[in-house]
């Protein structure tokens, strides 16, 4: 006889729910109902039941799951109840994430560099001005002191040069009528004067 097959003990995996979470269903209902002041709980429940395949459950079980989903959504900031817990439900506006403050460009080092160059230029300008002041000081002549007494011994009087005596010119007329000029010999007085000067 063929052996009997062992009975399979593995149970079939239970089929999960065919609908999304209650919170997502409520979000979808509010978006589609498009009411300005929010949607009432009754209208949201009707939309959820009509558009989702829910497992058969009692009305009390559905209401408890529905209320829990709204409460959790309010705590997480998904829903708003402006008129209290029994009032209409609205979707909370998501705040845009705060933009990080723009980083300041690192210009401190760049701005510091021109200052250094400016100080260097100023130092160079000061150095360039200093020689000018020295030159001006050098250019100013010191006041002349008292003239030094001439201590040098008086030089001997230079020997007088012999006096040049103009030789008198004698004009004579020849027989033919021509004029001739001849220098006369110096007189004895002139020769004596020159002799005295030489002795002195």
Swiss-Prot record:
Q: What are its GO biological-process terms?
A: chromosome condensation; negative regulation of DNA recombination; nucleosome assembly
Pfam family for this entry, one? Linker_histone
Chief location bin = nucleus
- Any GO CC annotation of this UniProt entry: condensed nuclear chromosome
Q: Which residues form a coiled coil?
A: none
* Disordered, as annotated region: 1-20, 78-200
What spans are recorded as compositionally biased (Basic and acidic residues)? 120-131
The listed locations are: Nucleus; Chromosome
PANTHER family attached to this UniProt entry = HISTONE 24-RELATED (PTHR11467:SF36), HISTONE H1 (PTHR11467)
Explain the purpose of this protein: Could act as an H1-type linker histone.
Q: What protein name applies here?
A: Histone H1
Organism annotation:
Emericella nidulans (strain FGSC A4 / ATCC 38163 / CBS 112.46 / NRRL 194 / M139)
Recall the taxonomic lineage recorded for the source organism.
Answer: Eukaryota, Fungi, Dikarya, Ascomycota, Pezizomycotina
